[in-house]
């Protein structure tokens, strides 16, 4: 008799045709809410429609349905991303000087937009070199395209069309996985399977295929371009892929095929998988052979990581077990219950992801200039400044979003009855200690960092430079930062003997790299001025964290309002009967946190912009003499508030203020208009709802007199809506003002 083990049944993880596709539903605004679907009585309706359209929690309490909506929306998001990418590549193919730039990247600026000659705006088409007139772009796409081996505009066209096809495919997938084959809740909660697929598939195979592309296509094409070969003479990508002898002429180890791999003689491949460090002196970018090696290594790591978790085969880690075993001597139940939180609250999940993604986006901002990855990126100062600023803002917004969704989790998804003595419960129980200590740290940092500047302003005003904190008087050197720099500069001879240079020239020790008479990168000196502004960074970051963390930890209750959880995520005040309870909702903490995030990031990008112009960016003469854009004035000028106002804001705003009548005049108009948008926000932030309602009643009376009153009653914005509109215009106006100021300046002088 043969005893067979029972066959494990394959679980069916999708529902077929769960929701029929209906254009009638689609055409009925607010179909997701009984109240909104009735149509507008007052103008508040349109605001509620926008506020709740994507708040899937408010449509239904069924977690499976919510999960499906989020999943479907992700495909819509991907579709928009592909559409945007397609547009970028199409502009490169149709309206750009990419081929001209490729032939002479040091003298020709990148442009992919030509303004039509209407109302005289053709003045905006400046001469970017090589006889091409257009708007100079600072997105870094040209440098990225060169690094990936794109040599002509036809290839850009094909990629643009491919991206459109993918956009359509994503739209279809979003519809299909909601209406035709919708995953069950168990599928969304199968974290081990998800980890395996995301790690091995997205990150592992993704990195591996990119490494493959770099080795077989990017490296040989860039080798030819660096040698000055005309792009039209370079073999096409498929010729390198199909013809190994062609690659072997450039990288001899290709002739040996896979033999060195299987005989473990891996060092043979060092000609195209290198470990050099530093920058390529021809392009001022990281060595592309280093980058290929990096992606191959990352691929191996993630392919291994993608096989660690227990799925159908019964071997590997179980995430629930890992979390529940995570206990220390002082942490009570540790992470017990965290698995349940993260598989039933997508807000908690999203909060963690936003915090990590935001942090890594800020890390990207800092690496883009210190280790410029693409050819000729380092000498395109406008692009350098834009990429840093962009990634800093994005990172700031994502981190505030992390706090927002953590607070929504606390209000909507946290169940205090089932949580006892786990880490989250312990944090909540000593939240007063956390917040009061953090508050003390903020006060300390604020008074001391600002106090150092005020001292300097006072001494400067009284004509006592010898009593100022500066590199030439009372020194406050950032000794820890200098030690970190020094350690990394010495790494190639000590901790990384295989490397020929340190990871970044900014650490020091190395020589400068100049390309086409412009500085790509050099060791960045840190002194008293940096010590001062770094403490302003510490101050603004801690205040942002204080506001956001207070919002999360007190989202459900506080001494002032013990029943806050019942009032929800956003509410203006605790009813008319209790004074002094406004701006206590979790939503209000996000609102207030956004302003401090704006403060924090502004100081960072101002510091970066001035420091780079003063100590890094500039031209180099044939004799090797470096002339920086602002002549190294950062160390002595930025140590007073007056110096920041006079030598940074005012002195460097001259380009945008004087841009009228030149090809930069659009930035002058934006500078003006964005100031206006910013000022407009104050109207919403400083005035109350009653003021506007009173005005509206008067205007409605006039309409009634003339018999032109609308059927929908006008209503003043609610308090929360007014704050939302206010902070949006504040941030939008502030960011656009900064953008115009930075770009007009750097395009003019860079």
Swiss-Prot record:
The keyword Transmembrane applies. GO terms for biological process: photosynthesis. It is a multi-pass membrane protein. The keyword Electron transport applies. Pfam families: PsaA_PsaB. GO terms for molecular function: 4 iron, 4 sulfur cluster binding; chlorophyll binding; electron transfer activity; magnesium ion binding; oxidoreductase activity. Chlorophyll a' binds at residue 675. Belongs to the PsaA/PsaB family. This is Photosystem I P700 chlorophyll a apoprotein A1. It comes from Calycanthus floridus var. glaucus. The gene is psaA.
